[in-house]
């Protein structure tokens, strides 16, 4: 995979569909001259859902499209016909994608299972038609609800690759050669630092029925946890690995001290995330073909005592001991998979559409302006978003509600006089004592 094709962090905008408006309608049939209300409800707005697709390995698609908007619900019609709900917008992301609210940083989901889904924006509830407002004394209501607005938000998507095992170590210790020797991956290999600029994934076959995914992480250097070199751009990709394969150039062919290299990488892992240092590690001494037998045994013994664990000597170039290493990695990966299988797979439950709660009793603010008075408040905004004041009955209901909450008395206290203009949203009214 080329550097420009690997994208592992993006910010996108999502908006769910708005609910459709309810209808004001009455039966109009030949032999029913005074038919009752039959206005249908508006359809619900479509939801925005993210889905983990195992066929994807990068967030590259989001580099070119960053705005995603679901369908609105259709408006209700006469004859009790409800509007069609908007279709949900399902957006595929790679398995291993972490979803965050871009404004708050809150983690909304960790899509670490194939086909796992999460709703990131709920559609608005469709408004009710006038059929719902009929009573024994209010038989011809000319009032219906507007649909609720769908949710909208900015999201940050962060990809953490889902590999079973991750190769870590300094640049030029032979990680790319090792993944090439062990798997079907064919990374670029050269004798200069940072040949690997993006993580490479390879499938390692054990037999016809057994395999695991191995990731070659770009070389780490001292202060990588602080951003040095390729730094922590890629350190997060090993957080999900079951086992870390720490590759060391035992030959010192690059003039490096293999003991110091081991210590630096261990320290950088601990600085970045202490949990990484607790993961199972396999220490691989690569390039054994460049040393004489006696010198090799001496260095392996020194490293084993220092690390206090078994060392696996290999030559990626000559494929020496590669099968032994593959079996050891698979042994640890298999144990991790058994633990994962015992965990229940999350079941996606679609939430209910957004429904704004409107209160009958509420406070509001009155502001004195150059041309009159302005009525404002959270519940005022909610009423205006729910009802169209151009509908006669909706207007009367709204004004009656304001009156019950002390509108006239408060205006009088503010010094209002006959003929003053009172603004409520985009609507203006004439004040009368």
From Swiss-Prot:
Q: Which GO terms fall under biological process for this protein? A: ribosome biogenesis
Q: What is its EC number?
A: 3.6.5.-
- Residues annotated to bind GTP: 169-176, 194-198, 216-219, 286-289, 315-317
Q: Which HAMAP family is this protein grouped with?
A: GTPase_Obg
Q: Which NCBIfam families match?
A: Obg_CgtA, Obg_CgtA_exten, PRK12296.1, PRK12297.1, PRK12299.1, small_GTP
What is the main EC category here? hydrolase
**Where does the record place the OCT domain?**
356-433
Q: Which Pfam families match?
A: DUF1967, GTP1_OBG, MMR_HSR1
Tell me the ranges covered by the Obg domain, including all copies: 4-162
Record's keyword annotation contains Ion transport? no
Q: In the UniProt record, does the keyword Glycoprotein occur?
A: no
Which cofactors does this protein require? Mg(2+)
Q: Which GO terms describe its cellular component?
A: cytoplasm
What GO molecular function annotation could you give as one example from this UniProt entry?
A: GTPase activity
Q: Which InterPro entries match?
A: G_OBG (IPR031167), GTP-bd (IPR006073), GTP-bd_Obg/CgtA (IPR014100), GTP-bd_prot_GTP1/OBG_C_sf (IPR036346), GTP1_OBG_dom (IPR006169), GTP1_OBG_dom_sf (IPR036726), OBG_GTPase (IPR045086), OCT_dom (IPR015349)
Its subunit composition reads: Monomer.
Its primary localisation, in coarse terms, equals cytoplasm
What's the protein called, per UniProt?
GTPase Obg
Residues where Mg(2+) binds: 176, 196
């Amino acid at each position: 995979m080329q550097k420009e094709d690997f994208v592992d962090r993006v910010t996108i905008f999502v908006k769910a569909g708005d609910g459709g408006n309810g209808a004001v309608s009455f039966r109009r049939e030949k032999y029913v001259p005074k038919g009752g209300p039959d206005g249908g409800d508006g359809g619900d707005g479509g939801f925005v859902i993210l889905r983990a697709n195992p066929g994807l390995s990068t967030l590259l698609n989001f580099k070119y499209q960053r705005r995603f908007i679901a369908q609105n619900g259709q408006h209700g019609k006469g004859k009790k016909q409800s509007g069609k709900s908007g279709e949900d917008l399902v957006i595929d992301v790679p398995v291993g994608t972490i979803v965050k609210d871009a404004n708050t940083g809150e983690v909304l989901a960790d899509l670490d299972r194939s086909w796992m889904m999460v709703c990131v924006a709920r559609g608005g509830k469709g408004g009710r038609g006038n059929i719902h407002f009929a009573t024994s004394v209010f038989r011809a209501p000319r009032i219906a609800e507007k649909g609720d607005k769908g949710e909208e938000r900015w999201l940050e998507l962060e990809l953490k690759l889902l590999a079973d095992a991750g190769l870590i170590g300094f640049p030029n210790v032979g990680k790319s050669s090792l993944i090439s020797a062990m798997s079907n991956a064919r990374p670029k290999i050269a004798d200069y630092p940072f040949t690997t600029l993006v993580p490479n994934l390879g499938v390692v076959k054990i037999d016809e029925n057994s395999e695991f995914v191995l990731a070659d992480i770009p070389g780490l250097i001292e202060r990588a946890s602080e951003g040095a070199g390729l730094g922590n751009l890629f350190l997060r990709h090993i957080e999900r690995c079951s086992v870390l394969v720490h590759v060391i150039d035992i030959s010192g062919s690059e003039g490096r001290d293999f003991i110091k290299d081991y210590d630096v990488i261990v320290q950088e892992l601990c600085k970045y995330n202490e949990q990484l240092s607790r993961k199972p590690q396999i220490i691989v001494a690569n390039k054994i073909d460049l040393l004489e037998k006696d010198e090799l045994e001496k260095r392996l013994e020194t490293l084993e005592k220092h690390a206090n664990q078994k060392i696996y000597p290999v030559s990626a170039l000559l494929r020496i001991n590669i099968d032994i290493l593959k079996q050891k990695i698979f042994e640890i990966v298999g144990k991790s998979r058994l633990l994962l299988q015992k965990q229940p797979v999350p079941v996606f439950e679609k939430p209910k559409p957004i429904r704004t709660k409107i209160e009958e009793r509420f406070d509001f603010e009155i502001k004195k302006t150059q041309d009159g008075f302005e009525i404002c408040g959270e519940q005022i905004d909610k009423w205006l978003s729910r009802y169209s004041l151009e509908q006669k009955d909706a207007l009367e209901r709204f004004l009656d509600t304001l009156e019950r909450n002390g509108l006239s008395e408060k205006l009088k206290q503010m010094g209002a006089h006959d003929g003053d203009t009172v603004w409520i949203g985009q609507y203006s009214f004439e004040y009368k004592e």
